[in-house]
Structures are given as structure tokens and as C-alpha cells.
A protein has these predicted regions:
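Short acidic, glycine/serine/threonine-rich loops at helix termini
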Residues: 25-29, 34-36, 69-74, 135-139, ...
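General beta-strand structural signal in soluble alpha/beta enzymes
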Residues: 14-17, 24-25, 60, 125, ...
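Single conserved hydrophobic/aromatic residue that forms the stacking wall/gate
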Residues: 1-7, 11-12
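Conserved catalytic-core segment of NTP-binding enzymes
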Residues: 34, 38, 42, 48-52
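A glycine- and small/hydrophobic-rich beta-loop-beta segment
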Residues: 47-169, 177
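Active-site loop-to-helix "anion-binding N-cap" substructures in soluble metabolic enzymes
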Residues: 21-22, 28-29, 44-47
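Hydrophobic alpha-helical scaffolding
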Residues: 30-34, 48, 99-104, 183-187
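Internal helix-turn-beta structural module
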Residues: 138, 148-224
Length: 224
């Protein structure tokens, strides 16, 4: 996540950036497959001694697909050709170990849970261009557990390990989004994908990344 903080005395804009994903949070993540600290936005406040009233905006960063490092439940995990393609094109390997990251389609249920526990005001979607390479794209919009539909994220790893994702499928787009710097330049199918995520998460997607360079960034709305 990223916390945007405006200093009231000197009017200096500062930002705080978390190092780990929300679902690794020791209290609100998929325990015991978590880290040893609070990785949600609130952890930044206690860690740095900042009052909640000083925070101007909380932004959450999501990839256009889902990844996980190490063990733990992963409802939308995929294998085979599609997983390998995403991993290779997106460079999804551990920064220090080089270990391949686990790959899955976008899990909107988990993402919506993350928006709640972090109190997100705004969302950044990265690596949209990676999805240029697929004829079909899936988004998990709910789960099925023991014949029942779940529209919430259960943090119990026993339940998570036995649920099935319910997908909404999108046609892939045959136009490249790589390095685009304007939302108007994105094709209509990719826009539909972004709009769907925005509607499900009920948080505005203000920034979209379409490549590794700084210039490959689309800013849709004023951030601060």
C-alpha cells in the first residue's frame, strides 16, 4: 500500500510505502502464512508514530493479476502455459532468491477485503500490459464453498484451501497497452476490464501502470 501524508506545519508532501502485501498481515492476513508484523496501512501509523488524523489519503497497489510467494492458500492460482507466460513476461521471480512466484487471475474478493482493512481511498493497477498476451482473461468475483456462494474473503486457511473461484471471463484485447500514458489511448476492452474492477472494489482506480518505465503511467484523477 502507499500512504499519502500532507504535513500540516510545513505543507511538505510525504509518502509512506509498505513493503509487504496486506494478506501477510499478522492480524488480518491468512495466518499462519503471514509475516511477523502489521503490513496493512494502520501498521505504518504505529510503526512511525503518526496520528491517524495526519493521513490525507490511502492508496492501494494491485497487479492486474495475482501473485503469491511461498506457501499458503491461493484460490485463483493457475498452472501450466498461462502461469508460465505471465511469470516470464512480468518477471515474477523473487528479488533475492530468484524463486518463481505463484501466479493467479485477479482475485477481486481478496482485493475487496484488502480495500476494507486498509481503508483505501484510491487504487493503482500495475502491469496491465502483461494481459495483452491472452485471448481470455478471468476475474474472480466470488467463491464457492461446500455448494454455497461466498462473496466475502474468509481468512481461515482451512476454508480458503477448499474453496473454488467463481470467475467472470473477459475477451482479451488485441491492441497493445504497453507504455501507454493516456487513458484515452487504451482500447475499449481493456477499459471494460478496468471498469469492472473499479465497480467491484467500489474504490476509484486513479493510476494505471502499463510498463516498467516511469513514463508508462496513466494518472486518471488528481492524487492529492
Amino acid at each position: 500500500m502507499a500512504l499519502c501524508l500532507v504535513g500540516s506545519e510545513m505543507c511538505i508532501r510525504d509518502s509512506l510505502e509498505g513493503a509487504q502485501g496486506a494478506l501477510l498481515d499478522i492480524d488480518h492476513g491468512t495466518y499462519p502464512y503471514v509475516t511477523s508484523s502489521n503490513s496493512i496501512s494502520g501498521g505504518s501509523l504505529t510503526g512511525l508514530g503518526i496520528g491517524a488524523k495526519e493521513i490525507d489519503k490511502v492508496m492501494g497497489v494491485f497487479k492486474a493479476f495475482t501473485t503469491r510467494v511461498g506457501e499458503g492458500p491461493f484460490p485463483t492460482e493457475i498452472f501450466g502455459e498461462n502461469a508460465e507466460k505471465i511469470r516470464e513476461i512480468a518477471g515474477e521471480f523473487g528479488a533475492t532468491t530468484g524463486r518463481p512466484r505463484r501466479i493467479g487471475w485477479f482475485d477481486a474478493v481478496a482485493a475487496k477485503y484488502s480495500t476494507k482493512i486498509n481503508g483505501l481511498d484510491s487504487i493503482v493497477i500495475t502491469k496491465l500490459d502483461i494481459l495483452d498476451h491472452f485471448e481470455k482473461i478471468k476475474v474472480c468475483t466470488a467463491y464457492e464453498y461446500k455448494g454455497e456462494k461466498l462473496d466475502f474473503f474468509p481468512t481461515d486457511p482451512e476454508i480458503l484451501s477448499n474453496i473454488k473461484p467463481i470467475y467472470e471471463e473477459f475477451e482479451g484485447w488485441d491492441e497493445s497497452t504497453y507504455n501507454l500514458d493516456s487513458y484515452e489511448k487504451i482500447n475499449e476492452i481493456a477499459k471494460l476490464f478496468i471498469s469492472k474492477l473499479e465497480n467491484i472494489l467500489d474504490v476509484p482506480i486513479d493510476v494505471i501502470s502499463t510498463g516498467p518505465s516511469r513514463n508508462a503511467t496513466i494518472i486518471r484523477n488528481k492524487l492529492i
